[in-house]
Amino acid sequence: CNSRHHSLVRAVCYSPFDHVGVVAINDQGDKVLLESCVIGCVAFDLEARVRQYLRHMAHAVAWRKLVVPTSTRDPLQTALTQACARFVEEVDGKPYDYSVMKIFFTMRKSASDASEGDASERAYYCSEIVAALYQRCGLLRKACNAASFWPGDLADGGVCERWLAEGVKLEPMVLLDG
């Protein structure tokens, strides 16, 4: 994004980017861009939000396609779509939470059930909401804490790749042209 705060986040995290969101499906079956930003957790219209980023809000916009195992794709697709839509509905309108204590002092591994993408009465940081959605859908192992992920952890070769469920992968990052 185009601000000093976001430049600082990139520098501190050694990350190519400072903010992440996730393309998700809402309960109407529409593709949305689910983000946690200063205005809170919001499911934005996908095309309109990407246009905003490309025109006014970011130096660059990139995406990574999530791939599930081909052999289980059909039976899994309905369950994934339903879990995704429920999560989007539960978190839309929740507050944003960027806490240095939360991010710096959260252990990567979690022995509690708090990492299961439970959306009740929570606030989220941008990369945390992505990890929590992946966990809810069974795409990211629950042995890690969603709050421990930084935006750069979702980049090519990032920590997130090591925590993906068996057979799930993220394709290489693709930059979008404005």
Task: List where the protein language model places each region.
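Cysteine-nucleophile amide-bond enzymes
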Residues: 1-178
